[in-house]
């Protein structure tokens, strides 16, 4: 008798991806974040769908429609805060997932890695446009400041910005198109995730040692399905604790004031997960230079496969590289802190030093240390 799970055209795909998938026997909890990101995406799409049923993308009613969702819609407050804090959980998982890839050398699967970087850009774009939708003060001014950066592009800059705005300032046309894009992008992200998995399953998963694990594989189910369920429960626990006890912990109080083009908030800053990039942007006194640094701060991830000069794939047996990696992590925390501070002494200089260090570690220090470690192997 044939097993439907292995022969049915549709079920067969699921079987090869999540049930009979050969997985390394030693992958740690750091490999849980892929499935958690999948869960985050599902949560965001579902809560977003229900929010879209009650939201109106008009400058006159957007703010009130969000208030209406929180006050009058059944469990609307829960859906709204799950969506807002779900974005934070999404980015926490993303940063940990990327960090895991950097530490264990997963970027040597460069198709999977590059699709992942494109996914990171897509999620950041989606989150930015979603933040504009409630049409509070920070929504409006955040949209104005960030879209205005494109005017730094030589020759076509101003025209491009006005084309994105759909007028001469951030207004009704901008809000409507941001809503349209915010709705459609998660589905594009879902398609990209499938491509990401397709490329991953061509090679199989990496593992903490960075060594080929073909001789020691175990089936994904039940071993890693059970392990993933633990991660899922912990993620839901953290998310629901945040949503039910302090839903506004990570938000900005300014966004509870309706958008007013005539009054600028004292400190314009994005959500916490963009602060590191915002700090890099602000650390360069030139507009175009800042924009380039902002884009490069994420785009630099695509260079990782080229900058890998070590004879070992993972950092597991490379103490000098490990040390530098954790300095990079500390540097990113510093940048995140600086991004939320006002532009004044000493924050300006700290931000500039942290930005220089960020690029120096990735482009110069880590590759150099890799070469030193290669030499040490021969001793």
Swiss-Prot record:
InterPro entries: Cyt_b/b6_C, Cyt_b/b6_C_sf, Cyt_b/b6_N, Cytb/b6-like_sf, Cytochrome_b, Cytochrome_b_C_euk/bac, Cytochrome_b_N_euk/bac, Di-haem_cyt_TM. GO terms for biological process: mitochondrial electron transport, ubiquinol to cytochrome c. It holds the Pfam family Cytochrome_B. Heme b b566 binds at residues 97, 196. It is a multi-pass membrane protein. Its main location: mitochondrion. The chain crosses the membrane at residues 33-53, 77-98, 113-133, 178-198, 226-246, 288-308, 320-340, 347-367. One of its GO terms (cellular component) is respiratory chain complex III. It is found in: Mitochondrion inner membrane. The keyword Transcription does not apply. PANTHER family: CYTOCHROME B (PTHR19271:SF16). Heme 1 (or BL or b562) is low-potential and absorbs at about 562 nm, and heme 2 (or BH or b566) is high-potential and absorbs at about 566 nm. Component of the ubiquinol-cytochrome c reductase complex (complex III or cytochrome b-c1 complex) that is part of the mitochondrial respiratory chain. The b-c1 complex mediates electron transfer from ubiquinol to cytochrome c. Contributes to the generation of a proton gradient across the mitochondrial membrane that is then used for ATP synthesis. This is Cytochrome b. It comes from Marmota flaviventris (Yellow-bellied marmot). The gene is MT-CYB.
